[in-house]
A protein has these predicted regions:
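Bacterial N-terminal signal peptides
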Residues: 3-18
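Histidine-rich, glycine-flanked metal-binding segment
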Residues: 23-27, 36-81, 96, 514
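C-terminal cap of metal-dependent C-N hydrolases
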Residues: 34, 333, 422-428, 434, ...
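Divalent metal-coordination and catalytic microenvironments
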Residues: 34, 49, 54, 75, ...
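Acidic, glycine-enriched loop/beta-strand segments at the rims
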Residues: 36-48, 407-415, 419-420, 468-478, ...
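Divalent-metal coordination cores built from histidine and acidic residues
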Residues: 73-78, 82-83, 87, 93-203, ...
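Active-site neighborhoods of metal-dependent hydrolases
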Residues: 148-151, 156-159, 163-183, 187-210, ...
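Divalent metal-binding pocket/active-site signature
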Residues: 195-253
Length: 577
């Protein structure tokens, strides 16, 4: 009887041990048998990936040990999470923290650029709330870092990083008027850039075709970019011109990088307007020449032949001097209206970048309105609205701005598909949607985004990799992950390596692609099955979990981390080649 009892006790102990082992597997997630593209650009391998906490724990063939969650990735591609190098989810993530349009494409890091959500003066906060569109929210922060803190506290699925806007800093000190800073004001602007860098900015950013940013001269930008470089950051910029004065605009970016010591990224690399499509070779040669001289220049792009912005890009900068309210007031004056109308009809102005001139009324598609009475015009071209209102397209554009009380969201069809196919293959090119991160429900259905909001990255993989063979999958993954991560000096992100953050995408390379169109833009992409962000599921079996997996990803001068703080010069930092 004693022997039986002892045997029973031993058996019970073994069973209990097995149950404990089953309850506490060594890993949180194991991804098994996938074709792994590690983000470095090297050839893929078939291995398992184990995740523990927010980090990758192990990568090897046939890993022993189970995960609390197991993903069978046989026949699937596994890669680092994609980096949206130019994103505008500033407001959309406040309304819905999932960012589903990008999440469904495998984006795990949204990088805010062109402007920033801080630092703000009380007047800037007031105007920001006054100018809000469909999404209403209180502006509760004032500092650059305060906005990132707010997002983290609210809860978001994607990681979010941000540059500090040169235009934001300019408005902080100078307002929205066409004025130049005094030496004391410029020093104060530099101080705001330094403060933002130490609060986590990745660098300095600008959009030089828009007012009031366009009022800044090159020396001002060099002075601000120098602070970014001293703080380990880069300079990202929508160039001052993308059509007739493209060469001069690219040269300005090169000059700023060379003089400041800050690496520069050219936003949405393009040649706008049919007459400029032949300039691609010259533009590429300028970048390659600068890089050969060890001036660090890179670029990013979206994968569509139309851009999306506002009707402010169709009108001269002088009429916009002082901000939106003064712009609208000037448009109501008959003399100003006539002058604007005449200047809009000049496709080759010398002092501003006329996107309307490159697209024409038929190539200007209306996407987003603030005024509910104008929303039925969504999806129509400017030419169609002009016909309905029985006036010229230029007058229609002016009236739209006045009636809507906003810049009005539009798409401009200006680029060449042949050029785009060459651009995606450039080795120094990464990718950005230049859009918000909406979700196809609720308030987001009140307007039409550009389809790139839902399709930019899936289109790269489906159309330009699988269908056209313009670049290989391993190269595309590298330039969605490891390449931009290195350019941004991100620590522990962009590659699949033990010890790195577990931002991981599992997708089907045979089916991944976009579904969004200009007429039906609110359609999520297909082919991405699972997305881990910081080791937790943000997308599982194609469905958003709603989990708050995201964090603020801050630059290397952030004083909240060991070794933070700005340096005496750019030479005190290590830079990506």
């Amino acid at each position: 009887m004693r022997g039986l009892a002892t045997g029973f006790a031993i058996t019970l102990a073994v069973v209990s041990a097995d149950r404990v082992g089953a309850a506490t597997p060594p890993y949180d997630v194991v991804i098994r048998g996938g074709t792994v593209y590690d983000g470095s650009g090297s050839a893929p391998t078939i291995v398992d990936i184990a995740v523990k906490g927010d980090r990758i724990s192990a990568i090897a063939p046939h890993l022993p040990g189970r995960g609390a969650a197991e993903i069978d990735a046989h026949g699937r591609a596994v890669s680092p999470g994609f980096i949206n190098m130019l994103a505008h989810p500033e407001v959309s993530l406040i309304a819905d923290g999932r960012g589903l349009s990008d999440l469904a494409q495998g984006v795990t890091l949204e990088v805010i650029g062109e402007d920033s959500m801080g630092p703000l003066t009380p007047e800037m906060r007031r105007l920001k709330e006054q100018r809000e569109g469909d999404i209403k929210f209180p502006v509760t922060w004032t500092s650059f870092g305060g906005y990132l803190d707010m997002l983290e506290k609210k809860g978001i699925s994607p990681n979010v990083a941000s540059f500090v806007g040169a235009g934001t800093v300019r408005v902080n000190l100078l307002g929205e008027s066409d004025v130049q800073p005094t030496s004391q004001q410029l020093k104060a602007m530099q101080g705001l850039v330094r403060q933002a860098m130490e609060e986590g900015a990745l660098g300095l950013t600008d959009a030089l075709i828009y007012s009031p940013n366009t009022y800044a001269k090159t020396p001002e930008l060099i002075a601000l970019a120098k602070i970014s470089a001293e703080c380990g950051g880069i300079f990202t910029v929508h160039p001052r011109n993308e059509d007739d004065r493209l060469k001069e605009a690219i040269q300005e970016v090169v000059d700023i990088a060379q003089a400041s010591g800050a690496p520069a990224e050219i936003y949405h690399f393009k040649q706008a307007g049919h007459s400029n499509w032949g300039k691609l070779d010259e533009e590429i040669a300028m970048v390659n020449s600068a890089r050969a001289k060890r001036v660090r220049i890179t670029a990013d792009m979206y994968t569509y032949t139309s851009g999306a912005t506002g009707l402010d890009a169709a009108m001269p900068s002088w009429v916009q001097d002082g901000g939106l309210e003064k712009w609208i007031a000037r448009l109501k004056d008959p003399a100003n209206r006539a002058k604007v109308r005449t200047e809009m009809r000049d496709p080759h102005p010398k002092t501003w970048d006329n996107l309307y001139g490159g697209a024409g009324a038929q190539g200007t598609l209306l996407l987003a309105f603030k005024n509910p009475e104008l929303k039925p015009l969504t999806g129509k071209t400017l030419a169609e609205v002009a016909k309905i209102w029985k006036e010229s397209p230029e007058d229609a554009a002016i009236d739209l701005v006045i009636k809507d009380g906003s810049r009005v969201g539009v798409a401009y069809f200006m680029m060449s598909e042949a050029n785009l196919r060459r651009e995606v293959a450039l080795p120094w090119m990464s990718f950005g949607s230049d859009q918000a991160a909406p979700t196809p429900e609720g308030v987001f259905l009140l307007s039409h985004p550009h389809p790139r909001a839902y399709g930019n990255f899936a289109r790269l993989l489906g159309t330009y990799v699988r269908q056209n063979h313009d670049l290989t999958l391993q190269d595309a993954v590298h330039r969605l992950t490891g390449f931009p991560a290195a350019n941004l000096s991100l620590k522990g992100r962009g590659l699949l390596k033990p010890g790195y953050y577990a931002d991981i995408v599992v997708f089907n390379p045979d089916t991944v692609g976009e579904r969004a169109t200009y007429t039906e833009p609110h359609q999520v992409a297909v082919g991405v099955e699972d997305v881990l962000i910081n080791g937790a599921f943000a997308l599982k079996e194609g469905k958003a979990t709603g989990a708050h997996t995201g964090r603020a990803v801050r630059g290397r001068a952030w004083t909240g981390a060991p070794g933070g703080g700005c340096r005496a010069s750019a030479a005190d930092w290590t830079w990506s080649k």
